[in-house]
Structures are given as C-alpha cells and as structure tokens.
Amino acid sequence: DAVSWYISPPNSRSATTQVYWQPGDGKKPARRGETSAVLDQSGKEVSTRETRGGFFLYRFHFDLHYMPVIWARYLVGVAAMFMLVAILSGIITHKKIFTDFFMLRFGKGQRSWLDAHNVTAVIALPFHLMITFTGLVTLAVLYMPWGIAANYAQTSTYQEAVFGKTEEVARSGQPAPLAALGPVMQSASAHWGGKRVGYLRVTNPGDATAMISVTRAPEGAIGSRGEEVTFNGVTGKPVGQSMAKGAALATESVMIGLHAGRFAEYGLRWLYFLSGLGGTIMVGSGLVLWTVKRRTKLPDPSRPHFGFRLVEKLNIATIAGFPAGIAAYFLANRLLPLDLAERADHEINSLFLTWLAVFVWALVRPSARAWPEMLGLVAVLFAAVPLVNAFTTARGLPASLLAGDWLFVSFDLVMLALAAGFAKGAHKAARKRVEAPRTTRRKPQEAMTA
C-alpha cells in the first residue's frame, strides 16, 4: 500500500541496493528503519545494524538536533552569513595575507599559533569561500522567499515554472503488475549516452496508474539536479523527460553540486576533506589566539574575570568536546548491542552526552589542567576506534589491508592520524602548564638583573 518507492541501485561507493518507501494512507513510521531496506545483488534483504551512521553527521551540519528543523536552518544560515562576512573582511583587512602564507615557524609560541592560523586560512581560501557561499545558496529560498512571493501567487506555480509541471496521479484502484525495472534502467541509460542511473522513484506501485521516474547519476556533471526520464509503470515505455534547465536553475544546480561534492572522484573528495580540516584548524587556532592575546591585557592575567574564564571553558568544550563526541559516536556504533531498542538514537545521544561531559569537566577544572586532560581523552577515543573495530568486526585494519578495502583502511588511518594530532596537542598543553610557573618565578629575577 506504499504511495511511492525510492530505489538507489549499486554504485562505486555501495555494493547494495537501498530501498525507501512512503507508506500509504498518510501513515508515518515510528522509526526511519521501518520504511527502508538494504538488498544484496540477488534481491534478498540484508540484515544491518540500526544506525544513522555518517548520514546523521551530514544532516547535523544544517539540521542540528533536538530542535525543529526550520529553526535549526535559520540558525545555521545566520552562522554561515557571519562566516562569509568574516572571510571577506579578513581578506580586505589582512594586508600581508599572501606573504604570511609562506611564514610557518615552529616552536615560537604565540607566533607559531598565528602562523598556523594564517597558513590554514590562506591555503584553502577558495574552498572556504566556495563552501560558505554555496551553503547559503542551497537554502536561499528559505532565507529570501520574497522574490517568489512577489512574482507568484502560489509556491506550486513557481515550482511548475522552474521545474516543470508534474501532475500527481491518484491510484485508480485497478491492480496491475509493475514493469521490470532492469529494462527501464537500461533504456534511461541509453537515452543519456550510457550514463549511469542515480535512483528511481516509483509512484503508485502495483496500480494501473504507476509511473517510474529515473534520474541520472551526477557522475561527470557538477550540477546536483540530474536529467530525468519518466516511464509508464505498467508498459515500461517512456512518456516524458525533464525540461531543459534555465540559467537560474542551472546556476543553482551547480552551486549545490559544488557544495555537496557528489560529482567528485576520490582525489577531489580528499581535497574537500583536507580543506575542511584546514578550516577547522583555522577556527580552532583563532579561538586559542583570541584568549592568549587578551590575557596579557587583563589587569591581573593570573586571575581573569568571569567572562574571560567562560570563553576559555567554551573553547575547551568546542575544540576538545565535539571531536570527543564524534569519536564516542563511532565507538557506540560498534559497542552498543545490536538488538537494543532505539539503537540509532542511543548512538546519537552518546555524541552529545560525551560533548556535555567534556564541557562539565572544563567548568570544574582549571583551564590549564583541563586542556591536556581533554585533548588526551580525545586522542585515546580516536585511537580506540580502529582497535574496537578490529575486535568487534571482520573489518579491522590488517584485514582491510589484506583485502585491499581502501575505504576502511583510509577511515582507520584517519582515526589514528587524528589520535596522533590530539596526543601532540595534549603533550604541548601539558608542557606549557609545567613551564608557566617557572616563567612566572623567573621574571622578578630578570627584572632585578636588568
């Protein structure tokens, strides 16, 4: 009795077929897993653990969590606009932006932090601009709906003008077998010159009014809105195709495609990842520099006021807390019982509970002690991910290397690299805490000598 099916066939990133369906009669499933299935190459359902995996992190970056989606997207939009303004104003005000790119001095204290901030900001500057601006474009209609309201009486009229009129046909109540999907996919692929099928949408399956819409995969095309061919769901014959994109729709499609990066091959995906990591370092080093520079200007740097202390605590919660939550999320995926009720929700809750725990720890501990403690915790958690993965599954790093499964190899190696980076940060923070009292005691002697 499903109203529609959504089918994603196997591709270079997945060996299984993903199937989702919309229940009929307005029914709403209690959980997402109740309206989805994973099929192997023979069409049999594969039993998988209940998880939202990386899809949650993808949705979290613009939908947040524990709050209505609409308000979350407004908050994300405000933050993205501030970021875009900060990047543009930074380019204008930073006179030595390209000169500083070649200045990276190690072991120079605050100077090294500033160099790291400048280098990570400049080296991926085109990416920072692109990802921020295109992120705003993806939700531009939500943030600026007035153009549509001023020119179209109804939103549906606008959608028909831009995307083409698509009439939803109600069920006739007359049963009819669905056409074989294999020949339909082959026909669509041939229409696109051999390009791969991205996904299929079947409306009114099992009814005489059934329709099959086949959308092209984004491979080889930056635009996010692939071409579409529609077939009669009973006869399997083509009955229509998507209209040619106008300039505005084509531009929007490219902007969203650049932001999502689904068109990218592995090399470009790694560049996206490393650029994003550089942006994270840029923000993190900026947060640390802000407190370091302002501490020296306080009346009594050893006893900062409440506002300054709060910023330090929030920095620890952000720089150490969120990565700790991510690592805990990965560990929960492997350690929670497979038959646990609402398992996917417990995985997500583990992320936020860990993040909260780090924040509470930062509140009750002196910042100088909390920094090495929490950075060390993050290092341990990330290092534990590949170890737990090896002991709880057949996808451990040695097994993945022998099998040539570079997707799992890359993931485990990235976890170990992050662990090493946070361990280095914990060591630096601990050494700085030990050296600080010595420096304080030495200053009066230096003053007397002078």
Question: Where do the model's predicted regions map?
Answer:
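Internal alpha-helical transmembrane segments
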Residues: 70-155
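Alpha-helical transmembrane segments forming the membrane-embedded cores
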Residues: 127, 132-174, 303-433
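Hydrophobic transmembrane alpha-helix segments characteristic of membrane transport
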Residues: 53-56, 89-112, 234-259, 295
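Short, highly charged, low-complexity non-transmembrane loops/tails of multi-pass membrane proteins
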Residues: 429-450
